[in-house]
Amino acid sequence: GCRTNQYEGEAIAAALEAEGAVCGEESPDIVVIVTCTITAIADRKCRKLIRRARRENPRAVIAACGCYAQKVTEAERELLDIDIVLGNRLKHRLPELVAERLAGGAPCIEVDGDIERENIWDSLTLDRPRLHTRAFLKVQDGCNHYCSYCIVPSVRGKPVSRPLAEAVDEARRITESGCPEIVLTGVHLGLYDKLPQLVRRIGALPKIKRLRFGSIEPFAVNDELLTALADCPAFCEHLHMPLQSGDDGVLSSMKRGYRAADFAKIAARARGVLGDSLHISTDLMVGFPTEDDDAFRRSLDFVRGLGFGKVHVFPYSPREGTPAAAMEQLRSETVHRR
């Protein structure tokens, strides 16, 4: 899953270990699956993984949390034979619910009531990375931008920022554990309310060697943030800024909130402040319903002209309940050809 999911998976493992669990892959008593729902393929993979976990571990407690789990119904829970379904802002409760299930409690669904209105921070913590050589540090959750193709706001909820002091303290513990590299992550990192201050505080930690962003929306890359990054010796010269399309008409239909020229100006400004060696990578969606052949060519021309270091290209996937899903869809062969 995404970097936010990876952080949450490690933090859940740490919480279970704190209650006496031992991480392992053979004959587990507890299987925790941190799910994703960004595309229809992600949904299918989650269901497949849950079924496999149950088939291979018939007596284990199977817990599903994360974005796909946020929308699981009781009928789906029964069909997939999941013991615990946990919503996106309640993952800190997993050790408690696992203990209840192991003690003979009933299967359950614990999902946030109105996640798009609740201002709740899921209080997971991590002292050191367990599965990676670099540490992901989640400092933000949720999104309220409602791009027309995106299901994330309905499953991740209202934007919320982790308290600055708490985030810095976790970064200190991680670096003092022997991990010198931190990747700041969130569902929409640019909505963190004190991001420049956070960069300066973490960058000043005595044992930090490398600081990165997972991904940041272009509008959040402003002069205040760029100055903080330029003043941070630990910051690695890389920004991943999702573009999605290089065509203004498609960007408008996507409700991205910027034009291609705006993105180009932000990229140029970032290179002007951080240096021409700045590596800018991006995401490019192909096959959006309003993307005709001319729009696709304009998007390609824009990408070629901007000089990205890396482009992650992926096909549009309709998500039920989003405005784009109600639009007339392109033929699948057209999408795959692009």
Predicted features by range, described:
Residues 1-185, 191, 224, 239, ...:
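Proteins enriched for Cys/Gly/acidic motifs involved in redox and nucleic-acid/cofactor modification
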Residues 42, 163, 259, 292, ...:
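Residue-level preference for long, well-ordered alpha-helices that form the structural scaffold
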Residues 291, 306-308:
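Contiguous mid-protein beta-loop-alpha structural module that forms a pocket-lining wall or clamp
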Residues 36, 157-160, 214-216, 256, ...:
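Hydrophobic alpha-helical scaffolding
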Residues 264-266, 272-281, 310, 320, ...:
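C-terminal accessory region of radical SAM enzymes
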Residues 62-66, 71-72, 175-292:
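Conserved SAM/AdoMet-binding glycine-rich loop
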Residues 2, 192-208, 254, 318-338:
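Radical SAM enzyme [4Fe-4S]-AdoMet core and its adjacent flexible, acidic
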